Structures are given as structure tokens and as C-alpha cells.
Amino acid sequence: MEVKDRNVSIHGTSLRGQIRADYATLVRLLGEPVPGDQYKTQVEWAVRLYDEETGASTVVTVYDWKQGDCYLGEGNGTAPEDVTLWNVGGYNGNAYYHLNTLLMEMREAA
């Protein structure tokens, strides 16, 4: 499983689960995030994961839902760099499964 595309349409994706990971780990795994809507999300990743063995791909979104100052008020939120619980979205449950697999592979390799 590898990150194939960092510029994907996420229209129609929805929450599939949550992961625990620090910001730096996600940056190493998925690249730099893009700004979120600055209301309920501060940053987000939207990527396509590709499985070389099967040829299948999965769109995955990762975002900090309602954790920042933009939602909770100035001084009450958590900076993206300090977030450790992230929402995972996609078109189906494969998004959560494949992202978790990729995270476990990265952690085992470290």
C-alpha cells in the first residue's frame, strides 16, 4: 500500500473511523496537509492509496474534526501539531482499513 495521489476529489466521502497518530507521523506518511474549512477542521489530507498487489485504490481523508480554535474559540482548541485523534473518511470502510495498515507498516519499520 502506498500513497499514489495527493490531489483527489473527496466529494461524497464520509466518516469511516478514527485513528491515533501524531501530526508528524501523518506528515511523514501522507505529506503536508492542506488547510481545512477553518470552521470545523484546521487541516486535512485527501489522498489515494494504491495497492500494487491487487491494483485497487482507495480515497482516504484524514482531518481534525472540531478540535481547533476555529471551532472551540480562541485559546480553547488544540493546534494541529498537537492533535493525536484524527477522523478518517472515505467512500467505504476500505479507507480506514488501508490507512490503518499503512500506519502499522510504518510503525513496524521504525
Locations of the language-model features?
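Short intrinsically disordered terminal tails
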Residues: 1, 107-110
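Intrinsically disordered, low-complexity regulatory segments enriched in Ser/Thr/Pro
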Residues: 60-97
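Amphipathic, interaction-prone secondary-structure segments
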Residues: 32-67
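Amphipathic alpha-helical segments
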Residues: 15-36
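Short, conserved charged micro-motifs
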Residues: 17-24, 55-56, 95-99
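N-terminal trafficking/processing presequences and adjacent post-cleavage segments
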Residues: 1-21
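Extracellular, modular beta-sheet/disulfide-rich ectodomains of secreted and cell-surface proteins
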Residues: 64, 101-102, 109
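Short beta-strand-to-loop capping motifs
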Residues: 19, 49, 88-90
